[in-house]
Amino acid sequence: LRMKELSNINSKKGSINYKIRLVVQTLVFAAFICLLIFADPIAEKDGTVDVFLRMSPLSAIGAMVAAKEFIVRYWPAFIVLVASVFLGRFFCGWVCPLGTTLDITDSLLKKRRKMISYKIYDGKRLKYYILAFLLLSLFIGHQMVGWLDPISISTNAYTVVIHPYFVSLINSFFDFLHKFYFVSFVSDPVHAFLKEALFALHPPFFRGHFIFLIVISVIIFLGLFYKRYWCRNLCPLGALFALLSGWSIFKRVVGESVCDSCDRCNVDCKMGAIDDTGMKTQAGECILCMKCQAICHTSAVRFTRTQPSEQDVPINLTKRGFVTACVSSAVVAPLLSLSFKKKKSQGNLRIIRPPGSIPEDKFRAKCIRCGECMRVCKTNGLHPTILEADLSGMWTPQLIPRIGYCAHDCVLCTKVCPSGAITRLSKEKK
């Protein structure tokens, strides 16, 4: 009877923990979206809109190592880094906007996933080699972290791809309603309010957005094979957190005397962190989503400080993998300097950077390719480079006056740069 009471208590606790995680994850994602939607008015009032970008330890390390200087603005990243030592990969399951996006899309792809019998490579160690590749490239002198940092990817996805298409869809919908007189007297004020409060006056258009559309589409549709495929196998930030999770105070432990090996936790684990028996767990792969604890009908799952050694599955890394990553970085990084555009006689590229940009070499080193400056540009004049700044400068911002001029009274792009690649300017100084 006593065991049954304890089991019921643990079951309720697991369900509560899971619901708390869902609420926190939803609120954090809503905050991320709101900061993107209301970036303009918040930045106008000197508010902080780049907090998520400054929370990425990977971006912080990338910008500081490449620029060879300490960037104080990345203090949130250090808090996350220290917290990950004690809490494991909590950031991936509770905070990361790309992870939340994949949770949403994976649920939409659930039926399709069950219909696909063919499986692709599911190698969790691959992300560690990608991390090694990126870190070595920094010491060689090239900043590639921004291309694969999940926070930068999320910001770009919603700024360059999703937001423009969403605005166009909303405008088309209200344009259709405008044709009906008895509806338009209500729909027109609503449309005007949405334009003023939520969207740009005109749908923004970004050159080269199709490239990022392909990138985010591939990341999403890999979910047809495995849930959170990006997080499992490719995310370098997740690899960094996994390396720190060995000291976590929340580790999955299974009561062997209670577990009936139903295998449900293994099937439902979105990270593939649980083995076929349901008893063993890769601590570095667990993102503390708490679902295994919530669905366990025998209440055998707990999260505690210590994990029995027989229940721990170590990271299976190979020397060959690391050597391959290092050699690849040494070969690929220098190739990024290949130029595809003619330069001026002084050797400078024929591109215009945003106002307040630091010298070009430092700019490339510090810029994390997040697209935040493009999001707040009122005239849609800032666009990502493709090959205009060589491969090493791909996806850094450039001003294209033919598309949108630089407004004399606007300094928003100088207020939202998380890394300091664009320094703050007053309107008078500009």
What is the predicted function of each stretch?
Residues 2-279, 284-430:
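Non-ligating segments of multi-cofactor redox enzymes
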